[in-house]
Amino acid sequence: MYETPAGWLSSLHPIIDGEVCEDRHHEWGFTIYRTEYGPSTDHPWQRLLQMIQTHAHKATLRVNGVTDDDPVFQQLWSLFRLDAQADTALSGLNVDQLRLLYNNSNGNLPPMNTDFPLHRIFLVADDVTFADAEPSTIKAVDGDYRAENYIPRNNWNGGQRYFGWMPMRAHEVVEMWKHLDYDCLDRIAPPTIKGSHLVIWENDCY
């Protein structure tokens, strides 16, 4: 499935008071929180960020079917941002605590996509991420998840299947962004099995 840089740019126009603002664009990308700290994770964290950035650039070129010198692509890529949040105050926070932080940040620069429906997702690099010598698996977390909306009335179909997040490959953030253009995370995420996330999401369209 291919996109065009112009079409992608048009999807980034903000809507204010019901009107599309064609002279403005949202930045696109994700906030990523680091929750594991210590000397052994400092360099892997930097390598993880660089890997995400590098693969995002390549994937954006590939999805658009263009080369790096395309002026519309250059405008699109200039709007990409990986908002890396690393502070020892985040150490050990779980996805529910991070979701509260994401939704209640009162700083001058709010997390990415808090005002961008369908893309209200953030990323997490935690102890599971840094258990690998070369971190490659992160969590994608639904900023709008409410557990009561996903608890089934009975367990005939195996109980609750979605818990507001999914594991994913860190090199596929662009592909996930494109999936989010059309679907919510609860439809994208692989179903859990007895509450366990046994399947890591991987792109199958872009």
Language model features with spans:
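Extended, charge-biased low-complexity segments
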Residues: M1-F163
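Acidic, proline/glycine-rich low-complexity IDRs
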Residues: N149-Y206
